[in-house]
């Protein structure tokens, strides 16, 4: 028989210990919707409130620098937005994939396997998720040394932290084998951005600098990503469908240029 507890008080000003995933300061006599509304109103009126979500601080680590001139660097593109060749040959799941695929930049066509955003914009133009056209143009111009002729893709939506870290380790090991100098990661929705962030962190632990492009920059920063560029929208981080084709390309190019510039900056963490 469980003993009834009247209140479990918060300790926002003091230290507390966690036992597993149990949060020790929630008043469970109020329903979750009531507690959520109380927090929302407190935030709106500028009053103090205590989040029920405990986030571990990002671990302190050194931030890798680009080891060569950008004009000689080999850049790899990665996305957590579920871009796959037409027909989805690897049967990439649309949620919580837990695996990744390696695909050519020269496929005849692409589709998206991802339940975290409206994929119609990317299926209309995949460059809105993965800026292949802008990167290829910058390669031709000599702004970068080489764009890898393939990209890595996974589906980050609904992927837990633990699974994201495990996936990140697998991808990082693959990246090392391909001898690249830097990585650009493009991300979609919230949990997908979180997954992409952990992938980037694991790659950086191997000494390769990463820039993450996402509309949800706060998530990436809170996870501990060193270099983050704000994308336009979770449905098209590197696109702007309202613009004409040339205008959208120039918009995407500016995002890519900003990301590449960040690779040349020295970050302190």
Predicted regions located by residue number:
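An N-terminal assembly and electron-transfer interface module characteristic of large anaerobic redox
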Residues: 1-269
